[in-house]
């Protein structure tokens, strides 16, 4: 909580001026996700703020809204790749799937594949050589677009675990 308060102070943000809190639901570290979500829920309840949840798969896909019929948004978990498929309006086409490198290359080599820049250093070289691989910067401003299109969770905010 101290880090959050320090962040507010350093950036001249008054918590009383906030109306919403956005919290990443994952995928990610078990303890980190639970801690982040619990903190966000606590602040939202105590200050009567709207709590909005998002996941990295959807967030990563935002730059490609209405640009591709199919968007595969990936992250890497240990030696496996997890992904979720979205249509051009960022509606889910698939549930989250966990596959290995060979499956990714065999089944999805020609489709648009998106990876967040913060995991690019963990990607296998063979994956980086595939067609239609995009490494993207995650931009917090994209969350406003997702919110305006009603694509974010507003009800049950819960962690997204892989494994």
Predicted ranges, named:
Residues 1-3, 30-32, 52, 139-142:
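A short linear-motif detector with a strong N-terminal bias
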Residues 1-23, 98:
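N-terminal beta-alpha supersecondary unit
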